[in-house]
Amino acid sequence: MDTIFAVSSGLLPSGVAVIRLSGPHVINIVKALCGHLPKARLMHYGNLTARDGSFLDSALTVFFPAPHSFTGEDCAEFHLHGSKAVVNRFLDELSTFDGCRSAEAGEFSRRAFMEGKLDLIQAESLADLIEAETESQRRLAVMGTSGRLTTLYRDWRNRLIKARAFIEAELDFSDEADVSDLISDKVWEDVEELCISIRDHIAQGERANILRDGLKIVIAGAPNSGKSSIMNRLAGKSVAIVMEEAGTTRDALEIRLVLGGLPVFLTDTAGLRETENKIEQLGIEIAKQHIVDADLVILVYDMGNPKEVNLPETSAEIWHVGNKLDLYEEENKKTWTIQFSALTGLNFDYFIKELESFCLRRVSEIGNLFPARKRQLQLLKEAIREIEASINYRSLDLSLHAEHLRCASVFLGKITGDIDVEDLLDIIFSEFCIGK
């Protein structure tokens, strides 16, 4: 097997650049560059020298002998000055060693998986942790790397294997009455409890999609109610055209924000009204589709001239908010639970706090343990289908019951990587950056 290397510390130039090395030739390479092998897991400062005797850099080196390393192989890290020239010269020197090459994306983590240092859930969560942009995404990733999900799924899988073993025992000893009683008393009760637990877990996973994929918030309302001004105020910059002429927004405009620690996709839509303009009609149809798909619809009214609009059927929460608070005298305006001026910012802080509270409320509806990725969720759904098939058709031959439970246990094993998932590995580890 080759020894691999990569810059694992990010873009250059930087204060420090960390070069990671893993594989069977690490010890010889470190000795050649440092002049000796540093003590394991202790940072060593000294000069690094090329094999032709030329000076490379003054650096910190740390050696991690197998199996006590990230990959489970011999590993080393070199902490160099973060100059492009220094790093490129050092990488060139590493490439001169036989069997030593630049790592592919995610190759260090893939080796850690192959050596049993990570399971598949932990590997996916590690990639998510590196990509996390919000606090909710960070917590989601940490949950996966902790191993708690793996423990849960392996426990469920072991319960299915045990149930299947009891069923096969009845097949082998069908003339033994005590064995038959054991099946009816133990197996189905436990399988039904397991089925309920997995169903609840799947429901949690459906709700938890917002942590990874974000909430969809749509700004809707009649033309010229100030929707684009709200968009610009929330974005903190001008992203939507604001004009006195009604109907200037013809398409949906989407931006990404972070509210209450959640990623939020905020969409400004065309004003809803009857029109003969074909282009505007198309924009209104697009707006209606966004409303259908939304988690929250902010229905905006001009407080001095509120116009009702027809919304499509949607499961989203709908807020009726009044805009242009600065333009109208108290006696000439309708009162709204949420009212502000997007143009001047009057009372807009309250609106933002309400949005953050909405996001936090959605997070609070999610439990502490749930599938972190759609791949995991899909395999759980496949497993539950097999379990339900076994439970709902008690008249099935016992061998078919056993087969349904076997298939369910295979799906659970694929989540953690305990069952062969070779076809998935290239996809999963390609998501990693070089050097991880």
UniProtKB/Swiss-Prot annotation:
It comes from the Bacteria. Its cofactor is K(+). Mg(2+) binds at residues 228, 249. One of its GO terms (biological process) is tRNA wobble uridine modification. GO terms for cellular component: cytoplasm. SUPFAM superfamilies: P-loop containing nucleoside triphosphate hydrolases (SSF52540), TrmE connector domain (SSF116878). This is tRNA modification GTPase MnmE. The lineage of its organism: Bacteria, Pseudomonadati, Pseudomonadota, Alphaproteobacteria, Hyphomicrobiales. The gene is mnmE.
